[in-house]
C-alpha cells in the first residue's frame, strides 16, 4: 500500500482538499492519502467545507491532524502545499511542493479555483503513479 501525505501548516484547507480528492480518485487497494500539518488549526476552514460539498465531498467532520514521525513512517511521498520555509520536511521521504495559495478567508470563487487546481494536480499524480481506480 502506497501512502501519500499532503501537508501544510494548519491542515485546515489545501491539504484536506488534496487528501480527499486523492482518496476519491485512487484505488484504495494501491494507495491512500493522509493530510496533516505542523501546527494544526482548530477546524477545517468553513469556505473549504462549502466548496468541497459542491463537488460531493463532505469535510464537515474532518479534523486537522499534527504531522508526526509515526504518521510519516511508511509513507512514499510528502506533498507540501506552497507554505515556503514553514512547510514540513520529513528526512528520507520523497517530497514535492505545490505552490498554492491558502484558501483561508478568501471569497468562495477564489476557493473554488484553488479547489479545482488541487483536483487537477491530484488527478495527474494518481495517473502518473498508476494508482487510479480501475473501470468497472
Regions found by a protein language model. Give the residues of each.
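Conserved active-site segments centered on acidic
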Residues: 1-68
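Conserved small-residue
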Residues: 11, 52, 78-79, 118
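Alpha-helix C-terminal capping/helix-to-coil transition sites in glycosyltransferase folds
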Residues: 72-74
